[in-house]
Every structure is written in C-alpha cells, then in structure tokens.
C-alpha cells in the first residue's frame, strides 16, 4: 500500500528537519549517563561472574554504556567521539522511557519508578520496561558471546524481576536457548562490526534485523500489559512497534544526534484518554505532529489487517462452496 512508504518519508523528513543546531554532544546523552556503570568491574562479582540487576535503572543503562564503550573503536572510521555509533538509539530510547515515567509501575500498586518512592526501580508490570529488557539483555549478552566484551560467555548473569521470572532469560545460554534466531542476528551484527571491511549501511541492515527480530519474539508475551494503561497510551504503544518496523525498512540511522532528535518528537509523558493530537496543549507542535502520524499508522495497519481477514474469509467460503459443488456433481 502506497501510504506506508509515504508515511515513513514524512516521519523521517520531520526528524531530519529538526537536526540543525545540535553541536554539544554531552547534551544529547541519556539521563544519568555519567552516573551509570561504564565497565564490567563496576558491577558486583560473585565466583568470577558479573552480576547485573537490570531492574534498576542505572544498572540497565550501564549495560548500554559498556556496549557503546566496547564498540567505539569500530565506529571511529565513520566519525570522531563515537557519534556515528548506531547503537546509540537503544540507550536514548531507554532514557526517554525513564524520563517520561514509562518504566514505573503502571498499576500504581507499588511505588516502583516514582519520585515519591524508588525512582531507580524498573517495574516488571511496565510494557515499555519489559520490551526494553530484551532490547538491552539480548544485544548485551550477544556482545559477550561474540567476543566484543573480552570475557567468556558464562561470566555474566542478569537477576530476575520479583515476579514473572519465566518470561525472561538471564544469561547467554538461556537467551540462546529461548531466542536462537534473534541471538544469531545480534551475533551476526557484532561479527560484521569487527570486520575491517564493514560498511555503514550494511551495519544498519544487520542492526535493524536484530532489533525487529527482538521485538517480534516478545511482543505477544506482554499484551496483557496494555490493560494497565489508558486507551491512548496502549494505542501509542502499538503504533510505536509499527513505527520501528517501518524505520527499520528505510534503515533509519540510529546515531547519537539523530536518535536524540528522534526522542524530541516522542510524547513527553504517558498519554491520557483526554489527549487528542494535534491539540495536546503541553506537547510541542513537533510532538503533536509525530503522534498524529503514529496514530494514523496504527489505524491503517488495522484496516489492512481487516481487509486481509475479509479476503481470507471470502476465499475460504468460495473454496468450501466449490468443494460442495464438486461433491454434488461427482
């Protein structure tokens, strides 16, 4: 359908138009970037194994920071200061989720993630936090598995959440067992990254393949979380996943400045049912426009799904009718 490529062009064009004027790279860093662990030795060690609690904001952010630090040398040929590292999109998206309250407990049964309680806590009931778990743990553990970290594959263990433990994996072995295809895609990305002949566009291709595969593996496991949010926020969550697929299709470059500008167009807080874009008064014009485009994408996707279902039903009914006619004639 012609609308979808057009939508991607409009959205990417909106982000590209906002790129001017960003020169201080330190301003683009995610929240509490400097306070996050920057090397494996910053984590607790037990029996020669690094123990990481990904349900604490700083510890999960540290996983991203270490990946960025360890892969910086491979991106030096594209630009100085690691600005062209296409892994920046992951921590910047995570930082946006934290800053906008999307990692907090949406049920409000606990004070996890709230300023009035444990503001560093990441709630396992958060849809955003659960999907981001896999967008942090799988690339991190694949980096370990592919040799980027310089340690053996059995030297890192992630701690489980307080509930729903079986929904997650915690080390290279268990994640490989649960998500073999996706872990292979992350490994392929890192292996190609380490090649002296790696090209920027091909790196984007491998990265987006791994990214979208990660979401596809896990999106259905957390559909029950939609019930914890307003209809507007749940709609936005579904739209966000669709947007990722289409940004992947055009190989959107998730470098530092571009990813930072991308976040500028995202909603600055959790959506309420009273929010109607483009008329949300505490959103910028850019944020209102982006939300309109995202909502439109979800509506079009639903329409396409409905049409495909109807066509399938027509084909099925026609086939059954033809079979009955053949049986009567024979």
From Swiss-Prot:
<comment type="function">
    <text>May be involved in early liver development.</text>
</comment>
<feature type="glycosylation site" description="N-linked (GlcNAc...) asparagine">
    <location>
        <position position="24"/>
    </location>
</feature>
<dbReference type="InterPro" id="IPR008499">
    <property type="entry name" value="Leg1"/>
</dbReference>
<keyword id="KW-0964">Secreted</keyword>
<comment type="similarity">
    <text>Belongs to the LEG1 family.</text>
</comment>
<protein>
    <recommendedName>
        <fullName>Protein LEG1 homolog</fullName>
    </recommendedName>
</protein>
<feature type="glycosylation site" description="N-linked (GlcNAc...) asparagine">
    <location>
        <position position="69"/>
    </location>
</feature>
<keyword id="KW-0325">Glycoprotein</keyword>
<dbReference type="GO" id="GO:0005615">
    <property type="term" value="C:extracellular space"/>
</dbReference>
<dbReference type="Pfam" id="PF05612">
    <property type="entry name" value="Leg1"/>
</dbReference>
<dbReference type="GO" id="GO:0070062">
    <property type="term" value="C:extracellular exosome"/>
</dbReference>
<feature type="signal peptide">
    <location>
        <begin position="1"/>
        <end position="20"/>
    </location>
</feature>
<keyword id="KW-0217">Developmental protein</keyword>
<keyword id="KW-0732">Signal</keyword>
């Amino acid at each position: 359908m012609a609308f979808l490529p057009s939508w991607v062009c409009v959205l990417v064009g909106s982000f590209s138009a906002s790129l001017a004027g960003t020169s201080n790279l330190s301003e683009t860093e995610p929240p509490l970037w400097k306070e996050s662990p920057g090397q494996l030795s910053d984590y607790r060690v037990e029996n020669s194994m690094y123990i990481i609690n990904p349900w604490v904001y700083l510890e999960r952010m540290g996983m991203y920071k270490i990946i960025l630090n360890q892969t910086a040398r491979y991106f030096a040929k594209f630009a100085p200061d690691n600005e062209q590292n296409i892994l920046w999109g992951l921590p910047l998206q995570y930082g946006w989720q934290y800053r906008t309250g999307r990692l907090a407990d949406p049920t409000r049964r606990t004070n996890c993630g709230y300023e009035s309680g444990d503001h560093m806590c990441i709630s396992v009931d958060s849809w955003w936090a659960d999907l981001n778990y896999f967008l942090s743990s799988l690339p991190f553990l694949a980096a370990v598995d592919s040799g980027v970290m310089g340690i053996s594959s059995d030297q890192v263990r992630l701690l489980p959440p307080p509930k729903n433990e079986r929904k997650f994996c915690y080390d290279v072995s268990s994640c490989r067992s649960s998500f073999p295809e996706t872990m292979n895609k992350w490994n392929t990305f890192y292996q190609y990254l380490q090649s002296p002949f790696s090209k920027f566009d091909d790196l984007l291709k491998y990265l987006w393949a791994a990214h979208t595969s990660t979401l596809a593996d896990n999106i259905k496991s957390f559909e029950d979380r939609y019930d914890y949010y307003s209809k507007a926020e749940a709609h936005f969550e579904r739209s966000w996943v669709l947007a990722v697929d289409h940004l992947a299709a055009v190989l959107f470059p998730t470098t530092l400045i571009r990813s930072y500008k991308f976040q500028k167009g995202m909603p600055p807080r959790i959506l309420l049912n009273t929010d109607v874009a483009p008329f949300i008064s505490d959103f910028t014009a850019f944020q209102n426009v982006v939300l309109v485009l995202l909502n439109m994408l979800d509506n079009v996707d639903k329409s396409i799904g409905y049409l495909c279902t109807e066509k399938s039903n027509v084909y099925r009914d026609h086939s059954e009718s033809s079979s009955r006619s053949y049986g009567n004639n024979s």
